[in-house]
Amino acid sequence: DMVFYKTAEEATKRNVSIVNCGSCGACSNTRDVGTYHKMSNTLTKAATKCGISYLFFGERVATYCMRESTSMTDACIDCWVTNMGCTMTHCFKECVLKFELPINSPNNPEGKSDSHVSLTSCLLCDEMYCSPNFIRSCGANRRCAGVNTDIGRPKSSICPSVNIID
């Protein structure tokens, strides 16, 4: 219902789906969060491929690529493509020149425990420069939506309260 509830209990009492922890935004809906869950092990690869198309062919092609690769809403796709542009602007060296794209450099290949997981320089750069705006505008990223992805982030960073009511 795009309402921010202070606690999961408050949302549960009102019998509404909890699609993400934190503020709501363009991706805070059951369709986009459902896509995050359905593509938990493939969305990074799809988005990276579309990010590469952004690099070579621009925003319009990246948007088309995301539409063809996912079932996200147009508003959420716009968020992802805007984030790709941010990453290109701020993290080109870390992600492209070092070829440390998420599909080439697994973040946690040894399955380390939460306290020993560290982000690749590409992911760390994106976290520092692009993630805050994504969260402000888009609401649900995969961690906020309770999705354990192929990136291998600490489990403690993944929202445990997501509960989508059919």
Predicted regions and their residues:
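General marker for long, soluble alpha-helical cores
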Residues: 1-166
